[in-house]
Amino acid sequence: MAGPVRGLPGQARHPVVDVHTHVVPKGWPDLGAACGGSGWPWLRIDSERAAMIMVGETEFRPVGAQCWDPAVRLADMADDGVDVQVVSPTPVFFSYDRPADQAVKVARIFNDLTLEVTAGGTGRLVPFCQVPLQDPDAACAELDRCLAAGHAGVEIGNHVGDRDLDDAGIVTFLQHCAEVGAPVFVHPWDMPGGPRLDRWMARWLTGMPAETHLSVLALILGGVFDRVPRSLRICFAHGGGSFPFWLGRADNAWHRRGDLVRGASSAPPSAYVDRFCVDSVVFDPAALRLLVETMGEDRVLVGSDYPYPLGERPVGDVVRRSDFLTDGQRDKLLSANALHFLGASMYTSRR
């Protein structure tokens, strides 16, 4: 189990489930040779413990052994007092902009390699898969294959090209997730571009929150939550982006400009906050208070974005530092809500 928790002095020990971590497995083949096409990501190995994700000849992101070595992950989990990690793909590998047959092959490669990483996690690393979301039938088939192989759920991006999460094909996939009991983690992946966003990591600091906000609105105003079963378990990364802060604005627009805003929804956006979860990656107790008050104490799950540099370390720090939380609420955020989100799939994946 996890080691000592870095929290407030005298604070009770709570189990911790981190629903937002990423993996970059080693050993993937030349994707151009394996899947066709060009300009694929590849891994430049710089040392035994360091590498660089390359896209073509462009450096995309430095990564370390935490991304592929379960022993390193478990050591970090012990330092942070984390009992379980949900291990999801790194979105650069989603390949939604590729032909579907290529995306199917890429998904299979990374999903199988992810299982090799999590197999070394002594049952504490819970794998989520990726799917070729641009092809609903192929996405459903790959999800089924992965669930049978030991994955506990699926991570998807927030859109496919110009298709948001209310797209008919994506809704078909979400309905399938509800039917088979697969939890869905939504992570932004393709952010707005242009020179104004090339400074200060602005794509990550402004683009990602805006993209997630839009994907939540697509599910609400696109009428998806009115069509898919309530059994769908879906969680949005990064605290739901800017959606929680601007929920009042969305409600106001729904009432005052319903001709433009209501779309296929049957109620204002605030009526749907019990249909989805968000993680706790907001870093500040005041922001977490807003998140809990807006979403409800049952709808916020600890996430960290481990092992990337914009993630939270130690994991769950903002939850432990937030003195407005009762002990019972803290327990919900640190683990109980995540266990409900994961459901039986977590235990199936850890057999």
Give the residues covered by each predicted segment.
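Charged helix-capping and loop-helix junction motifs
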Residues: 102-110, 166-173
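Catalytic pocket-lining loop regions of alpha/beta-barrel enzymes
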Residues: 143-295, 299
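Surface-exposed, active-site-proximal loop segments in enzymatic domains
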Residues: 90-106, 137, 199-202
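Mid-to-C-terminal alpha-helical segments outside catalytic/metal-binding sites
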Residues: 1-15, 19, 26-84, 112-120, ...
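Aromatic- and acidic-residue-enriched segments that line the glycan-binding/catalytic groove
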Residues: 28-42, 101-104, 170, 250-257
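Short catalytic/ligand-binding loop motif for oxyanion handling, primarily in non-cytosolic enzymes
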Residues: 24-28, 85-87, 93-97, 136-138, ...
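Short glycine-enriched loops at secondary-structure junctions
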Residues: 133, 188-192, 306-308
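Divalent metal-dependent hydrolysis catalytic cores, especially in the metallo-beta-lactamase
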Residues: 54-65, 74-97, 124-132, 152-156
